[in-house]
Amino acid sequence: MNLKMKKLLNGETIISREPGNSMTPILKSRQPVQLEPATWEQVEKGEIVYCKVKGNYYTHKVYGKNKKRGCLIGNNHGHMNGWTKNVYGKVIKILPPK
């Protein structure tokens, strides 16, 4: 089990630093974000979530919601990762990059 996922499922608020440029300019590579626990039902279109899609973990945006399929997850450049109900947390604060 992924450590971030485990902490979020245990109700912890955590700091996460994900590598990559898929969320620029909103998030830079390894820019810290504060995540609080959330389920797919609790998040809204446009929010940034920590989730698992097709076996991969992402800090990406919610582009849509559907009762049968969950959330449509994608990066900030228009690439869609797919639908998932495996949402573990949402970004509540974007912290300054180091």
Please place each PLM-identified region on the residue numbering.
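Extended hydrophobic leader/signal-anchor segments used for secretion and membrane insertion
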Residues: 1-98
